[in-house]
Amino acid sequence: MNNYVISLTSAQERRKHIEAEFGKQNIPFQFFDAITPDLIKEKAKAFNIDISNTNLTKGEIACALSHIALWHLAKQQNLDYICIFEDDIYLGNNAFELLKTNYIPENTHIVKLETLPFDRINRFNKTEKYILNRRLFKLNSRHVGTAGYILTNKGAEFLINILKTLNIPIDDLIFDEYLKIKEYKVLQMSPALCVQDFILNSKTNFKSSLQDDRAIRCNNEDKIKNQAKLKKPNYFLTKIQKELYRPFKQLKQKVFTTYITFK
């Protein structure tokens, strides 16, 4: 098992949580010291990533580079698989067996282990594999979050070769933008094997400055987009049409899509 948990060296409370969480199922792992904002220029240059024109916050860039660093580690060590986690996750049942990776179909780039309650997926996606009462199916639509995933050797090679600029968050890249590429294969595990603390618990145990920064950036970008929309001709007509279509869209989502649970 090549299990790595990205964590700031200063995040002792989170590290204790991970030690306890992985310890419950006797799962071996290593902490990977997260890249900090003061190092992003140095690390981006080392990985040949252009961050000169990005709107991302320094925290978002540091997060992305921490993941990219592990992709490079996997490639350098020629690992068949690497399991990458963030330090605020909880693991589901049978995690020890499911992290062995010997069940993963060929030509897979990533197996996404995590779920978020924001993005719906097609309930009729073809199942590629059943394992311990869970199924793996090809992810064809947006389902973001990088708190838990298995990256294959092929996947590491693919992502390192294609990612040259950071203009959007890392999870939007690998679990949305790149899904448009035909040969890129991401499998989603359902029910999911891990979930972040802020999803599982109504009272968040681990405050995240990264989530706060991202929320502020997104709100600012939304304001700019909304102002631009108001200036467009036929804006109000388009808005009325969208509102009329909304009930049909909601019905379609209810029939054809679903959320991924955590178990």
From Swiss-Prot:
InterPro entries: Glyco_trans_25. It comes from the Bacteria. Its EC number is 2.-.-.-. The keyword Transferase applies. Keywords: Cytoplasm, Glycosyltransferase, Lipopolysaccharide biosynthesis, Transferase. GO terms for cellular component: cytoplasm. CDD domains: Glyco_transf_25. One of its GO terms (biological process) is lipopolysaccharide biosynthetic process. One of its GO terms (molecular function) is glycosyltransferase activity. It holds the Pfam family Glyco_transf_25. It is found in: Cytoplasm. Involved in the biosynthesis of a moiety on the core of the lipopolysaccharide molecule. Belongs to the glycosyltransferase 25 family. This is Lipooligosaccharide biosynthesis protein LpsA. It comes from Mannheimia haemolytica (Pasteurella haemolytica). The lineage of its organism: Bacteria, Pseudomonadati, Pseudomonadota, Gammaproteobacteria, Pasteurellales.
